[in-house]
Amino acid sequence: GKGERLHPLTQYRAKPAVPFGGKYRIIDFTLSNCINSGLRQIAVLIQYKSHSLDRHIRYAWNILTPELGEYIASIPPQQRISEDWYKGTADAVYQNLFLVDNEQPEYLLVLAGDHVYKMDYAEMVNFLVENNADAVVGAIEYPIEEATRFGVIGVDQDHRIQQFDEKPEHPTPMPDDPTQAFLSMGVYLFKTDVARKYLSEDAKRNTKHDFGKNIIPRMIQERRVYAYRFQDKNMKAVKYWRDIGTLDAYWEANMDLVAVDPLFNLYDQTWPIRTYQGQFPPAKFVFAQDYQGGRMGVALDSIACGGCIISGGRVQNSVLSPNVIVQDYAVVRESVIMENVVIGEHVRIRRAIIDKDVIIPPNTEIGFDPEADRSRFTVTDSGIVAISKGMKLDAPIHTSV
């Protein structure tokens, strides 16, 4: 999709290419799951504003061995079947069935590139085989009162899917817990011949050409389709899966990373999250001689990536991408600051998302006056302020540190 709910972060890039967690892109989490699960033939279907995503895949994910038949390849619309672009998630796969035919795999795994979670897809394949299923949908338990925003799965005692409702007004509860609903994670595993049949038939119908709205609901009437209960490799008390399709969800997911014991663990070396490693110097924190006057470069409960210079400013509960500069007496709280942002002297920022290449002039305040913020920036209903990439603010700024 176009990622319109994540605007302005998707103004110049596809949603999976949006920076996340300081040094990553959103798609890195799905691709890391693939590699950690032992998958080695991966096609990334790209369409809208794809340059940034395509470049990231080439730079960050050129890690496999083509001589062994391994690859991660970005595939734009080929127009082999018609002159149409991808008309939906199912149509995107249908238009690229020639790739599947070339490889002739026994199973076809279809994933969303804009979710954050850790999952071993090999375990899902084992589940499909054990249940002699034609298809399996990854599912996670979720409070039933919050499930109306997602695709909800109704299952029997054996987890065979009985119904599939997209954003229902009254979600179906789980059979063993009426306070929980089963949500679709956007993870679909098929026997390849079954997927080919239903995708080909759907292409001839007047539908949305969507897995959740069309393919799966039709399959559960005719085939053995099961829900696979998400086994989280994040290893926390509460399972972690986030669809970060809105600014609020994006901000909240970044804030999940900065606690002393973060909800999502980036530091588990048994399940590494891979990305492009830019050649940046170490982060630097300077000026400690004037603590009483507030001139102290410090970052608390925060992530600061390579190349960052906290030069007499204070950062708290925030995520800083590479090469961010925070100057004297500036204060940044509960914010996501992307690459090459300069934050001037005496600036105050709270609950903001600032995209790349923005210079914040001295004495600017962001996140304190909703009306003033709305006149210049995007502000969500919950008060999160989003500033687009390269936005020019009025006053000049001194960038020496």
Spans of model-derived segments:
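Left-handed beta-helix
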Residues: 193, 201-401
